[in-house]
Amino acid sequence: MIAFLWQLFVQCAVSFAATVAFSLLFHAPRSQYVPCGCTGMAGWTVYWLTLFWPGATPVLASFTGALALTLATRIFSVARRCPSAVFVTAGIFPLVPGAGIYYTVYYFIMGMNDACLAKGVETLKIAVAIALGIVLVLALPGRLFHRFVGREGPPRA
């Protein structure tokens, strides 16, 4: 149990640091580094924990991770009065299937067509799952998040 909690802590810390580093490269506002890191950490933590479910696949884990990070994105965008694109762009970084894309191209170049096709289809499924998770949460009405955070909306001019 202690080993699992230690792994969870390390996963959270590394995903937070990686997302903050990507926020720096992405030129996110300095005041938004910590919320950006929290969105990436939320998405990766849910992804990692979902993989422990019986029968869970990386596609399902990516979908649940995308749901979690987009929920965090919507909450932070209302609470911090900042566009959600700042948080979702940085927060998606840990979930992007970069290794899958790399291995798809590697197998293609090496002439391993069966492995290329299998890895390419899996990578495409993960990418679609992430996109669906983001779209589902972004389709929720904004008033829901304004009420959740306790604000009625942007200030009127």
Located regions from the model:
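The feature identifies polytopic integral membrane transport proteins across all domains of life
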Residues: P83-F93
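Hydrophobic alpha-helical membrane segments
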Residues: G91-Y103
